[in-house]
Structures are given as C-alpha cells and as structure tokens.
Amino acid sequence: MAQRYIGLLSGTSMDAVDAALVELEPLRILATHSIPISLALRQQLFAVIERSTTSLGELGALDIRLGRLFAETALELLAKAKCSVTEVQAIGSHGQTIYHWARGPDPFTLQLADPNTIAEITGITTIADFRRRDLAAGGQGAPLAPAFHAAFLRSPHYHRAVLNIGGIANISFLPADHRTPIWGFDTGPGNTLMDGWISRHLNQSIDREGRWAASGRVNKTLLRYLLTDPYFSLPPPKSTGREYFNLVWLDHILSKTGIKLSPPDVQATLCALTIASVKLAIQSSSPHTEELLICGGGANNETLMEGLRKQLAFCRVTTTTAYGIPPQWVEACTFAWLAKQTLEGHPGNLPEVTGARHPVILGAIYPANAAVSSRT
C-alpha cells in the first residue's frame, strides 16, 4: 500500500482548519475535511494578533486549544475516509501563524496548534514548526510552497507560475527547463485586507465570490498610493504577513491621503491591489510566463479571478484543478509532502526562494504514542 500522509493548516482568515489525506508519488488526494473555527476562538486569535501585547497564559492556552482542534480535524478526516491511524505515516501540521517577521537582526515566526497535543490525541507522528529552521539558516521562512509546486506542477513544455492566494499571496516561477532553478516570493496581500475590510463593515469573514468588491468601483488614486509601499519594489527573496499588511496599514494610508470612499469602493480597490501586485511581480521577475495556475481561497473569488485574467492577458490563467489538485487543498497537500520530506531526511526549503544559506530539513518530529495507535 502506498504511504499516506495528512496535511493540516489554518490560513490567515482563520475561519477553518483544513485537512487532506494523501498518497504521494504519485499524488492522490484520498479525502479532505474542514472544521470551522468557532467565532469565540477566532476572536481570541485576532485579538492576540492585533494587540501589541498578550499574556503568556493566553498564548499557551490558545496553543493547546488549537492543538486539540487540529487533532479533532485529523481524526474526523480519517473517519470520513474509513482509514485507520496505523495507515498514516505522519501528519504535517503548519499550525496557525500568529506572527511572522523575517527582517532585522532577530527574525522569527510563531505558529500555534501544539504538535505534542496533536500527536498524543491522534496517535500519529506529527511534524510541525516548518519555518524556523529556514529562518535560522538565514532565510525568510517563506514561502515554502514553491518546493511542492516544483515537485508536482512543473511542466517541461511551458514557463509556468503557481500563485497561491491565501491571506498573503505567494508565487512560484517554474521554468520549463528543469536545469533552471525555480524561484518565488510573497507578492503582497492576497485576501487579508479584503477579509479584514468586509469583517469591519459587514461582519462577514470573507467576500464570497468577490460580490462586494464587484459592487464597488476601483479608485485609481488610492490604488497608486497603495502600490507605493516599499514592499512591492523590494527584490526577492522576500516574505510578508498580516503583521504588515493589515487594516492599521490601510487606515494609515486612508488618513494620510484624505481620500474618502464608500466601503464597497475601498473593497474594489483592495481587490485591484492584489491583482496589480501580482502583475507587477510577474512582469518584473518572469515576463515570459506562459501559464499561471491559481490556488488558495482566492481562486473562489470570481471578481479577483476575472481581474487577473484581464490584467494578465499575456498568459493563460487557470486554477490547479486543471492539473488534478483542487485549489483549496494545495496547501494541505504541501504540508503532507513536507512531512514526508522531513521523515525521510530530505530538505524542504529552496534557498533560491527563501534566501537561506543552504537547504535544510524542516520542522520537528513529535513521535506517535504507540499505546494510542494500537487502540485504533
């Protein structure tokens, strides 16, 4: 039987924990499952992220609660798939990013969802904390997805790019010539600003299908101001997060410029910002890109997808579904694959992407509790 792995993560929207049960080499998705994050837990997480201070007790409690929720998601996934824990080699858990700051003399990243708890409850060896070893080696700790994209989505026929639109958007450039290294970076905000803005004004977690953005009009003056942020002109390797691109950042620009817009017009402009920053990334880094594959939650935003197709008319824009991986499950598959890389002693980072001094084996291994495994 082919080896099976589980990938677990919660994205920057923090609306659910996603899990995928996969076989690798070749990749086959056996089952997927999501558990919504309760409003109370979500509000606690946002409060920790948005406040400049929090108590160690609060942080520790959230770590355990998320660990239990991640474990519950994995077990429900296995029940759905009628798969025993003994059939699973490992869980790759990204956790929930609370902070990611790759600049300055002391770069660090922090993800919650205690892997000890996950391993103990599930009885499955769990690999977690994937980003910090790359940071220790001088890298950005992100993006990590390009290594997975290269393994499963590279084409010998096309200069292809893969764009993951989560809270932050990251892109991988995959040259057709396999002798040419791939590269990639975070392009800037994906959904995070749009999610935050609609939450503030309509108390909704996401702009479903981009309908609210579609109801507004893009303000070109505001868009130009947003694009003057230094991040967009930084050369790669580079990474960013909601610590930087957030509503505080947006409010500062709105206040500084004095531009008065309706909330839907701001939403339309934020959608245009994601599109424009992606276009800038492609034109400056790989203008000969022939095909762009979209994955992540942004693939469900019709307004965003339509804008990308219009602005990137020089290449074919589609989703990863065309190549057998549903867009919403690419990241979960990525961490399942990274778990396998770690267990087998293979590096999971790409120094040409993250800027690390050398390839490194990512993450820490939390062995299964044999007593729990034997009962399942």
From Swiss-Prot:
Keywords: ATP-binding, Carbohydrate metabolism, Kinase, Nucleotide-binding, Transferase. ATP binds at G11, T12, S13, M14, D15, A16, V17, D18. Gene3D superfamilies: 3.30.420.40. SUPFAM superfamilies: Actin-like ATPase domain. The lineage of its organism: Bacteria, Pseudomonadati, Pseudomonadota, Gammaproteobacteria, Chromatiales. It comes from the Bacteria. This is Anhydro-N-acetylmuramic acid kinase. It catalyses: 1,6-anhydro-N-acetyl-beta-muramate + ATP + H2O = N-acetyl-D-muramate 6-phosphate + ADP + H(+). Belongs to the anhydro-N-acetylmuramic acid kinase family. Catalyzes the specific phosphorylation of 1,6-anhydro-N-acetylmuramic acid (anhMurNAc) with the simultaneous cleavage of the 1,6-anhydro ring, generating MurNAc-6-P. Is required for the utilization of anhMurNAc either imported from the medium or derived from its own cell wall murein, and thus plays a role in cell wall recycling. GO terms for biological process: 1,6-anhydro-N-acetyl-beta-muramic acid catabolic process; amino sugar metabolic process; peptidoglycan turnover. It comes from Nitrosococcus oceani (strain ATCC 19707 / BCRC 17464 / JCM 30415 / NCIMB 11848 / C-107). It is an enzyme of class 2 (transferase). InterPro entries: Anhydro_N_Ac-Mur_kinase, ATPase_NBD. Its EC number is 2.7.1.170. The gene is anmK. Pathway: Amino-sugar metabolism; 1,6-anhydro-N-acetylmuramate degradation; Cell wall biogenesis; peptidoglycan recycling.
